[in-house]
C-alpha cells in the first residue's frame, strides 16, 4: 500500500511539473508572437487576412474566400468585399474596396499595452477612404472603413506573417 501511495504522489508531481512547463512554453510563444506583431507594424509590412465582415445594414457574414488588407511600406493593398449603400458611383459600381494605392496618411499609436491603433488615409479615382485598424499582441485585428460615398463597414481577421 505504501508503494502505491508513493507512486501516486510521484505521478501527480510529474504531471504538475509537466503542466508548468507547458504554461511556460505558452507564455514564451505569446511573447514571441507579440514581438513579431510589434516588428511587423514598425516595419509597415503586414497583412491581415479577413474572415468576418460587419456591414452597417444587415447581419455579419463569415467570409470563405481569401480577402485581405496589406500594408507594404507606403502602399495599401485592399482586397475586401463590400456590402452596403453606395452613392454617386461610376456605372457598374466601380472598384469598391479592391484597389492598390499609395497611402496619403499613416498614424500609429500603441494603446493599452497589448493594442495598436493605426489610421490610414488613402485616395483612389473614386473616393477617399479612412481605414482604422486595431491590432492586438496575439495578431487578432479589426478594420473599420469609412468613405464619403459608401456606408461604413467593419471586418475582423488575423495578422499573417
Which sequence ranges carry the predicted segments?
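Sec-dependent bacterial lipoprotein signal peptides
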Residues: 1-20
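Bacterial Sec signal peptide processing site at the extreme N-terminus
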Residues: 17-36
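Short, surface-exposed charged micro-motifs
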Residues: 38, 66-68, 132
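A short, Trp-centered hydrophobic/proline-enriched beta-strand micro-motif
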Residues: 38-53
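Structural motif
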Residues: 45, 73-77, 140
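N-terminal post-signal-peptidase region of extra-cytosolic proteins
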Residues: 51-64
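Mature extracytoplasmic domains of secretory-pathway proteins
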Residues: 69-115
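Helix-rich interaction surfaces within compact, conserved domain-sized segments
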Residues: 101-161
Amino acid at each position: 500500500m505504501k508503494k502505491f501511495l508513493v507512486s501516486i504522489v510521484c505521478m501527480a508531481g510529474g504531471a504538475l511539473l509537466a503542466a508548468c512547463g507547458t504554461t511556460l512554453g505558452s507564455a514564451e510563444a505569446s511573447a514571441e508572437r507579440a514581438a513579431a506583431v510589434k516588428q511587423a507594424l514598425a516595419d509597415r509590412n503586414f497583412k491581415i487576412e479577413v474572415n468576418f465582415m460587419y456591414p452597417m445594414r444587415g447581419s455579419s457574414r463569415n467570409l470563405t474566400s481569401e480577402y485581405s488588407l496589406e500594408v507594404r511600406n507606403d502602399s495599401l493593398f485592399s482586397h475586401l468585399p463590400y456590402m452596403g449603400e453606395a452613392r454617386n458611383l461610376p456605372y457598374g459600381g466601380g472598384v469598391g474596396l479592391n484597389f492598390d494605392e499609395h497611402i496619403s496618411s499613416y498614424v500609429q499609436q500603441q494603446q493599452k499595452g497589448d493594442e495598436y491603433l493605426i489610421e490610414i488615409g488613402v485616395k483612389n479615382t473614386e473616393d477617399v477612404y479612412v481605414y482604422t485598424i486595431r491590432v492586438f499582441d496575439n495578431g487578432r485585428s479589426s478594420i473599420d472603413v469609412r468613405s464619403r460615398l459608401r456606408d461604413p463597414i467593419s471586418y475582423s481577421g488575423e495578422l499573417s506573417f
